Amino acid sequence: MINRVDIRAVEKDLLKTPKPIVIKFQKWIYDIEQFGLEEVRKVRGWHDHTLKGNRAGQRAIYLNKQWRAVYVIEGTEIKIVKVIEVHPHAY
């Protein structure tokens, strides 16, 4: 069961991230540690999905409509790659 999350790569970014987003991110980490990744993926509210293109092999969750946490699975651990703000595409 995958239930460990490594956030070392994004610790500095989280200091600049809005507090409600950080709280939601911490809730996701808590859920992973308590229930494991497979169970948390079943929760539709996180919108856990695979990424395509230059982020192929990575997964993401929605923290809200504008913010995502991007992660990869390495062995029995989740490594957070980035917590990013998504901007609407210009048409």
Cite the ranges covered by each PLM segment.
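Arg/Lys-rich, positively charged N-terminal/basic patches that mediate binding to nucleic acids
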Residues: 1-33
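Sequence-level motif detector for i,i+2 pairs with an aromatic at +2
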Residues: 1-2, 46, 78
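Generic structural motif
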Residues: 4-5, 48, 69
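Enriched for short, Lys/Arg-rich terminal
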Residues: 12-16, 20-23, 59-91
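A short, surface-exposed loop/turn module that caps and links secondary-structure elements
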Residues: 34-61
